[in-house]
């Protein structure tokens, strides 16, 4: 079966340009139809899927998640404790001090990020409130002007001049005598 670039892009979850780039990286022979569109076979699709999945797995393995939780910190502490048993007490104290400073820094950074997020939300809420108050003022002004205006009388619909029926022209009396 033949597939076009947009279909494969949708399957892989990438852009059509990325599909062409992946095909070039895999050295696939890409055929074009009479309109200049790339045509891929089922084998090409399978190869690209395998390649794309392997790339995703690679990127996930090389880039661990940035979230740190208390469980992760505790796990690191236990790992450090096992290593420390083999190291002298002086080195152990240095490592624990470094670990404590790092955890404090992480906690501070998390608090700062949370504070910034809260500040952004607060600013957005205040902005929305201001906009709503401005809209309310405009509505009140419009209501006041409508109340001041005299009542509007609705006139019956009349057709515009260009749509009115034309009255037949009266023939001149002389023409009617001669039958013209």
Curated annotation (Swiss-Prot):
Its main location: cytoplasm. Keywords: Cell cycle, Cell division, Chromosome partition, Coiled coil, Cytoplasm, DNA-binding, Sporulation. Gene3D superfamilies: 1.10.1660.10. Signal peptide: none annotated. One of its GO terms (biological process) is chromosome segregation. GO terms for molecular function: double-stranded DNA binding. GO terms for cellular component: cytoplasm. It comes from the Bacteria. Residues 89-151 form a coiled coil. Residues 5-25 bind DNA. It is found in: Cytoplasm. Required for the formation of axial filaments and for anchoring the origin regions at the cell poles in sporulating cells, thus ensuring proper chromosome segregation in the prespore. Binds in a dispersed manner throughout the chromosome but preferentially to sites clustered in the origin portion of the chromosome, causing condensation of the chromosome and its remodeling into an elongated, anchored structure. Belongs to the RacA family. This is Chromosome-anchoring protein RacA. It comes from Bacillus cereus (strain AH187). The gene is racA.
């Amino acid at each position: 079966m033949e597939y076009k670039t947009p279909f494969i892009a949708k399957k892989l979850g990438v852009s059509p340009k990325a599909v062409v780039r992946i095909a070039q990286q895999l050295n696939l022979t890409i055929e074009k139809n009479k309109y200049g569109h790339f045509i891929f076979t089922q084998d090409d699709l399978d190869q690209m899927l395998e390649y794309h999945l392997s790339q995703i797995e690679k990127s996930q393995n090389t880039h661990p998640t940035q979230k740190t939780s208390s469980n992760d910190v505790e796990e690191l502490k236990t790992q450090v404790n096992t290593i420390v048993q083999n190291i002298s007490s002086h080195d152990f104290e240095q490592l624990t001090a470094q670990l404590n400073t790092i955890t404090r820094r992480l906690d501070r950074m998390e608090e700062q990020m949370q504070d910034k997020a809260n500040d952004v939300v607060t600013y957005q809420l205040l902005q929305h409130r201001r906009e709503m108050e401005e809209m309310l003022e405009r509505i009140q002004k419009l209501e006041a002007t409508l109340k001041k205006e005299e009542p509007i009388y609705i006139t019956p619909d009349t057709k515009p001049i260009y749509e009115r029926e034309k009255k037949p022209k009266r023939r001149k009396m002389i023409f009617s005598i001669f039958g013209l």
